[in-house]
């Protein structure tokens, strides 16, 4: 059975008219490097997750949001004076979200873009009914234009694999709604059903999978949940200062890094206990990464300063194999070794907010992804066509051969 490799020059399987029981031919394109918080209500009140099909179609690749109207006792005094619910849905939406610009909400009602689950079109006079679920489109803030180069690495009628650039979020979140891989791909591919099967952090580039149909979502999600996927990442970071750790990382088997990682809501960095701390506290490690250094070099002082690394310290090109998939696992593990990834604005310390630095992106790349296709049974092997800018002028033969 053939293996799909993203460096083979085979045509893309596009414009597929019907489903079949086997995957079509792969798309394989090698790419060049491109240098380039809730007020008071319960957290489940306003969400993108849903079991029902929304009564409004996507707009420019963006889903409508759903909102369950709170009961008066759940509302602050300014929205429900004396415990009385607002008279109309429009009154509530304006008071809660757009008190200084009510026309935003009025325009949604005027265009029929506020609806109930069953598709009933609401008006500005529709009465407020606690517990009722409504759907509407939020007003989008201006977003800075982010990279859009997402070459297709593989595609069949079930799944789409792209090569995500640095700085592009995977899904809408926070201040990024339109400028995300999901939204841009839905528009570009003309497929409102696209859903990411896994995620990459905004600063991380590389291989990213999307399910193309509702039926394909669960098989691929289960594939990741049951860890039936082999992943490797590339990173550029200092060589560990500890001689033992450095020696193991430079060895053929690599260095196995274990820790306990916990993601805390609204905290940018994860909380991490080293393996030694886990033993002392009686806590089981929940993460494992194999870190192998493929090559080392010592940058000149100007380059080291530009990346915020002390001059004279050698850097390494890392091959990272995560055996678990916790938030920020690779970034946290290299930081644990005293070798934070170049360009990281969260580790070892959170840097002040500022504009993206296209010339100094996080030096982390989701490099390869291999799995047995959960629907067709075909072995799939994908590889990013990108490199890392801190390594570009170094030994390319090491990159290609590893």
Where on the chain are the PLM-derived regions?
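RNA pseudouridine synthases
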Residues: 2-24, 35-402
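Charged/polar low-complexity intrinsically disordered segments
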Residues: 29-30, 34-35
């Amino acid at each position: 059975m053939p293996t799909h490799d993203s460096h083979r020059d085979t045509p893309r399987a596009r414009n597929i008219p019907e489903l079949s029981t086997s995957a079509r031919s792969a798309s394989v394109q090698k790419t060049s490097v491109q240098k380039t918080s809730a007020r008071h209500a319960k957290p489940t009140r306003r969400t993108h997750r849903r079991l029902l099909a929304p009564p409004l179609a996507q707009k420019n690749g963006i889903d409508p949001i759903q909102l369950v109207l709170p009961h008066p006792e759940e509302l602050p005094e300014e929205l429900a004076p004396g415990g009385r619910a607002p008279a109309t849905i429009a009154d509530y939406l304006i008071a809660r979200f757009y008190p200084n610009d009510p026309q935003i909400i009025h325009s949604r009602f005027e265009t029929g873009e506020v609806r109930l689950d069953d598709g009933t079109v609401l008006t500005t006079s529709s009465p407020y009914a606690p517990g009722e679920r409504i759907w509407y489109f939020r007003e989008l803030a201006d977003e800075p234009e982010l990279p859009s180069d997402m070459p297709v690495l593989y595609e069949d009628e079930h799944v789409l694999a792209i090569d995500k650039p640095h700085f592009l979020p995977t899904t809408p979140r926070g201040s990024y709604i339109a400028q995300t891989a999901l939204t841009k791909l839905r528009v570009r591919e003309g497929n409102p059903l696209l859903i990411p099967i896994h995620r990459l952090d905004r600063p991380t580039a590389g291989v990213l999978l999307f399910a193309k149909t509702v039926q394909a979502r669960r098989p691929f999600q289960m594939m990741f949940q049951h860890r039936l996927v082999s992943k490797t990442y590339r990173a550029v970071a200092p060589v560990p200062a500890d001689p033992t750790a450095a020696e193991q990382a430079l060895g053929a088997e690599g260095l196995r890094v274990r820790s306990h990682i916990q993601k805390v809501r609204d905290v940018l960095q994860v909380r991490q206990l080293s393996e030694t701390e886990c033993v002392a506290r009686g806590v089981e490690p929940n993460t494992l990464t194999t870190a192998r250094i493929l090559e080392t070099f010592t940058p000149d002082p100007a380059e080291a300063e530009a990346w915020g690394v002390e001059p004279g310290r050698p850097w390494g090109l890392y091959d990272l194999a995560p055996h678990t998939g916790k938030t920020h696992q690779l970034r946290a593990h290299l930081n644990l070794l005293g070798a934070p990834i170049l360009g990281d604005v969260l580790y070892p310390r959170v840097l002040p907010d500022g504009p993206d630095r296209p010339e100094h992106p996080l030096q982390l790349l989701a490099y390869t992804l291999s799995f047995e296709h959960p629907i067709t049974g075909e072995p799939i092997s994908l590889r990013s066509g990108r490199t890392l800018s801190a390594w570009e002028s170094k030994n390319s033969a090491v990159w290609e051969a590893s």
